[in-house]
Amino acid sequence: MSRYVGAIDQGTTSSRFIVFDREGSVIALAQAEHAQIYPAPGHVEHDATEIWTKTQSVMREALEKGGLQPSDLAAVGITNQRETTLIWDRKTGKPLHNALVWQDTRNDRLVAEFARDGGRDRFRDLTGLPLASYFSGLKLRWLLDHVAGARAKAEAGDVLFGNIDTWLVWNLTGGTEGGLHVTDVTNASRTQLMSLKTLEWDEGMLRTFGIPKAMLPKIVSSSEVYGETRAPFAGVPIAGILGDQQAALFGQTCFAPGEAKNTYGTGCFALMNTGEEPVPSKAGLVTTLAYRLDGQKPAYALEGSIAITGALVQWLRDNLHMIKDSAEVETLATTVEDNGGVYFVPAFSGLYAPHWNEGARGLIIGLTRYVNRGHIARSVLEATAFQTHEVLDAMAKDSGIPVKELRADGGMVANNTLMQFQADMLDVPVVRPKVAETTALGAAYAAGLAVGYWKGLDDLKRNWGVDKRWTPKMDAGRRETIAAAWSRAVQRSFDWKTDED
């Protein structure tokens, strides 16, 4: 058998290819960033052709770094930024428009239009999701309404829809020459077009949103052999697909109900495995697919999605020039003992879970002449922990299962100040695993299981280990006081943007 498994990790800011061995250790890695396109306030786009080019580049580079050939790979898995929405011409393979990124809010009027009859939760029982600009279905509707000729071509089957997983699989398996048009259940569950119960496209949702079924990919499991790569990586089975946050849950081996992880990246995404039945949320979370292995029952999850966390540190660096690199925010934050009474609500594109307020906008509140740059930096880090606290509290209310330990991954887990404050706010331990690349590892695990590289979930659990554990140190009175202050700040951010803006 081939010695390794590869994973394409296509994220919001970069594309990576990582090669893992049987113990889940990284053998080779390559990464390439792609452009972030901001054509107007609230608009965020990616060039899908650039993403495909960069994906091929990092695959070549990683194999070269490892001295490997495609034949050394038993399988390749794919994990991707979810919700980012693309349409392309089946015959030419060219996108009809830049991809609308998950953060893009240009469809907010469509959201409001559909919410007028039945409110934002009118489709929640069916799809698990509230009406929000975040999800793919109304991004796709916007493209069909605004790209000349797109709807007619889509109805004829000449225009295809996909999230980034679908785009990559289609190109990897031949593109215009017989490329496979598929998506897995985790990505499909983020479109608001799939029934959580049947795991199929829902005809009623398609009619309501005005989406031609002919343009949609086939829904498949998260772990099976879908097809093989074509040149220049010919013959490698593509055998795993997971949306990035579900991939992190899988890579963190959260296979039992009540086990939870939080990924600290551009945004924050907390998921809790809830088992074989979907748990409806009454506390502002979304109900989603955790994963589905080939031939097995699906596992469901509760998710709290937070739009801006690591991106707030980038904003501090790129827009305010308060720091030179992202790591410097911790140094600056530790120059002060606390936040000085300052709270930063990073509602740059509204607020996601648990508030779902499209009109919220960012604010810094509590400023006095006492406040300095250190307090601002600390408030930036604390905003991530406060938002995560809100989401984990909602998970406990919905599931009836309090989180006993939070498994953390993503770039921000290197920040000890943030992780300690997170443990303090949650009042439970926060754990960083030995293998940091949990998202890519989850995709590799899904692919490896499908081809027998790993025999079962127990093999994966044995690979997981603790790198560092943070335990709570804050007293309950202090925790309650600052949590209440944060809640007041959040309330003041609501509904700043109006239809006239």
UniProtKB/Swiss-Prot annotation:
GO biological process per UniProt: glycerol catabolic process; glycerol metabolic process; glycerol-3-phosphate metabolic process
| One CC-aspect GO term | cytosol
Instruction: Name the positions where sn-glycerol 3-phosphate binds.
Output: T12, R82, E83, Y134, D244
Binding-site residues, glycerol: R82, E83, Y134, D244, Q245
EC annotation from Swiss-Prot or TrEMBL: 2.7.1.30
UniProt pathway:
Polyol metabolism; glycerol degradation via glycerol kinase pathway; sn-glycerol 3-phosphate from glycerol: step 1/1
Source domain of life = Bacteria
What Gene3D superfamilies does the annotation carry? Answer: 3.30.420.40
PROSITE patterns noted in UniProt: FGGY_KINASES_1, FGGY_KINASES_2
Please verify whether the record's keywords include DNA damage: no
Instruction: Report whether Transferase shows up as a keyword of the record.
Output: yes
- Which UniProt keywords are present, listed alphabetically? ATP-binding, Glycerol metabolism, Kinase, Nucleotide-binding, Transferase
Binding site residues for ADP: T12, R16, T266, G310, G411, N415
The UniProt record gives the binding positions of ATP as: T12, T13, S14, T266, G310, Q314, G411
Modulation of this protein's activity: Inhibited by fructose 1,6-bisphosphate (FBP).
Q: Reaction(s) catalyzed by this protein?
A: glycerol + ATP = sn-glycerol 3-phosphate + ADP + H(+)
* MF (Gene Ontology): ATP binding; glycerol kinase activity
Pfam families for the chain = FGGY_C, FGGY_N
What's this protein's family per the entry? Answer: Belongs to the FGGY kinase family.
Please name the HAMAP family in this protein's record.
Answer: Glycerol_kin
Q: What the protein does?
A: Key enzyme in the regulation of glycerol uptake and metabolism. Catalyzes the phosphorylation of glycerol to yield sn-glycerol 3-phosphate.
How is this protein named in the record? Answer: Glycerol kinase
Q: Which organism is it from?
A: Methylobacterium radiotolerans (strain ATCC 27329 / DSM 1819 / JCM 2831 / NBRC 15690 / NCIMB 10815 / 0-1)
Q: Which gene encodes it?
A: glpK
